[in-house]
């Protein structure tokens, strides 16, 4: 499971690079000029804030993977990171409608993120439920 969590960290750092390239990829230097000052600022602030969230996800995944797998807080973070990517996949369908092949590829990429964190999350939580029935205490 630790390999999946660390792979999730690399995956998140891939999104850090991708989001930092938005200005070049999407020609934001020109395209954002068509927006109002407020909307232009919001787009850039949201993108940079999301990029920092990916740095956090990636850092925790790479350097604190054991804590993610072995602590209650870590289990919660794994579930939340998996839900983040699942919700992003749903948003891909809702807002991009999968009308372009690239949109379908991104759907798969976002579902991969949900799996990279969801499988370890499920595996980490299930043993916690089993430990209550391990013979160490009364069975409820």
Which stretches of residues belong to each language-model region?
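Core segments of alpha-helical transmembrane spans in multipass integral membrane proteins
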Residues: 10, 14-23, 38-66, 79-87
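Membrane-helix boundary connector in multi-pass membrane proteins
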Residues: 86-105, 123
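Juxtamembrane helix-break-helix junctions at the cytosolic face
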Residues: 58-75, 93-96
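Juxtamembrane boundary at the C-terminal end of a transmembrane helix
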Residues: 117-140
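Sequence termini and other peripheral, non-core segments
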Residues: 1, 13, 86, 90, ...
């Amino acid at each position: 499971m630790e390999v999946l969590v660390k792979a999730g960290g690399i995956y998140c750092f891939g999104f850090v690079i991708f989001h930092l390239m938005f200005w070049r990829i999407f020609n934001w230097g020109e395209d954002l000029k068509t927006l109002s000052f407020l909307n232009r600022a919001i787009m850039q602030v949201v993108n940079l804030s999301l990029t920092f969230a990916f740095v956090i996800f990636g850092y925790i995944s790479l350097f604190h993977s054991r804590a993610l797998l072995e602590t209650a807080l870590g289990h919660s973070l794994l579930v939340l990171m998996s839900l983040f990517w699942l919700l992003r996949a749903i948003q891909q369908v809702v807002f991009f409608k999968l009308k372009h092949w690239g949109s379908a590829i991104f759907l798969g990429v976002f579902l991969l993120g949900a799996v990279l964190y969801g499988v370890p999350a499920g595996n980490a939580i299930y043993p916690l439920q089993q430990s209550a029935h391990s013979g160490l205490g009364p069975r409820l």
